Amino acid sequence: MSELSESGSYNSYNSLSAGSPLPLQEIFNGAETKCQSHYLQSRINTNYEQVKQQLKESAEKKNSSKIYSSLQHLTYYKVEKDLLETILRIIDITDDKKTLRLAYYFLGEISQFKHLINNSTEIKNITTIFNKEMQHKDISRKVVSLKTTASVAPNDVLIDANILDVISGILRKVGEDPDKTQKKKGFFTRATTDLGRERSLLQYSCFVACRNRYKNNPSLFMPIVEGIKCVDPVGARHAVSLTLNYALENPSTVAATTKRFIPLLKANKGKEAVYLVDPFARRNFIKLCGHLAATPSPIGNVITMENKDFFQSLCQSVMDAHLSVAFYAINVLSRFSWPTLESAHIDAIQFDSELPHFESLAFQTSLIVGICNKMRIGFNTYSIGAYSNYSMQHGHHHLHHYHQGGSGTVGGSVPSSSSSSSSSSNITTSALSSGSSSNSSLSSQQLLLVQQQQQQLLHQQSNPFLHLACKLISVLSQSYVKYSYPKDSTTQQPIIGDWSFDEKQYQHQSVYPYHHNLSPFTGLPNPISNNNNSSNNTKDQSTTTTTSTTSSSSNSIHPFSSLTQLILNLLNISPSISIRIQALKALVWLCPSNLDQSKLYLETFRSQLRDPYHPTHLFKELFLELYKRIIATPILSPMILELVYDWIDIIPSKCDTSLVCEIWKTIVEFGKVFANEKLLASIFKILDRIVHPDFRVLAMEIQKDIIKFLGEYSNQITFEQPSRFEQCKSRSGSNQQQHLSNMSLNSIIQRLQQYSIFSPWQIRLESIDSLAKIAFQSSTVVKVHIYNFLTLLPNESHGWTTVKSNTSIIVNTLDQLLTCRAKWLPLFKSSDLSQNQIKDLKNDHTNLCLQIGLFFDQLSFDYLPLGIESKKYLGSK
């Protein structure tokens, strides 16, 4: 690429050619004036300053051809404010439409410098040119002048008054025109003559000018609201948007004014109901209705008599023939509460030539049913292309399959989402099967026909629609699930439910190898799984009383269950990862709140885990949605624990252990014994799994994160409290027999001790840290046990220097803790402490908290290392 000539150099700037790259900062510094086209730079010998000078000279000489050529060259540069006078002069002297088009384009570009236009001469010139243009006979010049001037003119009282006067004159209603020039009815709606068409264009320009300059001007309120009936489609779109701006500030006034425009409202039959041709205008009107319908009432956020008509308009808009408009209405409806949606309906719709964009509806139907039907229509229309796209990507395989007499389906089964989808996909099948029945191989003509049909189907694919459809199904299903799931009568939180469904799955496995017949949390015999109504001390009474409620709610039919197969088909036919993610999110909320009925979804999610081509972020999105699901419906936690195991076992390289730990933390926070049993069983199952040699490094990193989790949450999982077994007579383990009262914690400690001896040094280091965290948060007998273990820990292995150093710190801290505990416990129980003793107690408490706090990300503010007895003396701390 050639450099610019010497006469056309960039001064301090170099060329932006691809062959001579510049430093990034230098490019940014020259961005305001440099040429924006590398191709132009290589073809012309002028720069921005030269083009600007040529334009000024041509305007002074009124040379039309040079003005036009200079404006053409200027299109490749970013203009500056100093061109304002030149552009205004060109508009004043020329009548050539091509030149005017470019001049107004650059005048609009200068609008970004409107805050710098403060010279009285510049303001006067803008006003003069505007007034002259508005008197011109050419309607197009009036339109573009009004739109552009409203953007570029600075905030000046005289300019505002001038523009408002022009807008008011154009939008003035019938009877308000002092010159009586407009006496026809339908000022906004009739445009059968040239005068009417010109009027509609001017109205359009007024609405655009108002959006650019006067969004909420009180004097223009009524003309703008009446402008919803503007015959110009785009003008009506802008009028609706302006009305929405008014509604944000004064919804009650706008609601009373615009209710008469609602289409399909019985009260508006034969009156002023608007026919919005433009789909974007209808979407804006739906947004307006949604805002007015959702306006809070004095009695709460419910649908009242004042806003029910707007809500009903949203329901009727679901039957819009344009799918984008219908789905926009569904999107707005999804923001309302589930009881409101569940009780809503769509009134019968008869074909009306004035409202052809609404589909006919013979009978009144439920809103949810109408939404499901519209979803099916959308999938029937747009998911065919996805099937075609998938088929084209696997073209040779499918052609060979058809030639051998195969069924011609993806994955071995015909997508059963709809009859139209099947029939459309069978076009290719029938053509190929007819060829295979008559000949042993497909002819070139048949192959060409198949490719043409696939290309036609490909044009019907709409990834944005499929993405939006899955997202709406997910949002609506989430609203239903959160509302219908049983809540606790006192806390109004989702109940934990009964997880005994898969008890047999774990009955043959020994999570706690030394106590097969004992409950790991109580040390008592395990209760019979079938006797759920018997007295069980390990389950809270609230859980047993709500089990029947959970079952009855879980067995109810999901209102969007009919769409499940459509979503499942997307996982088989859509090659788009974003659509697969949205489909999986929808399936998460379509899953029934019942462990037995969720098996299909469990296997579906497992099959996605086995797909080697899925990226990591797909699984993160899936498990993040599952994390939200167990918060809303804790009953599904066992299913999600199984999926977590598969995630770690099948694809450890794509596993996010931080998200896994958040899921486990949520289950711990349920605070139920049986929930913690299931969680601990799942964790031990992960730790005991057989690891493939190729994944040992990854497995070690995952194991470290799990061990860290156990160190932080073992006390919550096993309900171990520091206040248990306060009497401690020696460190020799005189109370060791009391370990059996908390077998789950004993099992965790045994595993961590094993890892501390026989594992690589990284695992040993993490295990010892976890043992320390457990000791600091546990009773004295546990502290003594871990202290004795760490003091006797062997030290002959690779990497022991680091481990030994860390262990030494932990042992010293535990030694101080136990020494202080033995010192203060007799004093706590004998008599009240003196002021000096309280001062010493506070010092010991502070020192221990500082040392122990090094092992935790954030130590609890109410942590008492010296026991619960010290609380009354530390209250004034």
Curated annotation (Swiss-Prot):
InterPro entries in UniProt: ARM-type_fold, TSET_member_tstB
Biased composition (Low complexity): 412-437, 529-556
UniProt region (Disordered), positions on chain: 398-437, 522-557
Quaternary structure annotation from Swiss-Prot or TrEMBL: Component of the TSET complex, a heterohexamer composed of tstA, tstB, tstC, tstD, tstE and tstF, which may act in plasma membrane turnover. tstA, tstB, tstC and tstD are likely to be the core complex members with tstE and tstF acting as associated scaffold proteins.
PANTHER family the UniProt entry points to: SH3 DOMAIN-CONTAINING PROTEIN
Protein name: TSET complex member tstB
Species annotation: Dictyostelium discoideum (Social amoeba)
Native organism taxonomy: Eukaryota, Amoebozoa, Evosea, Eumycetozoa, Dictyostelia
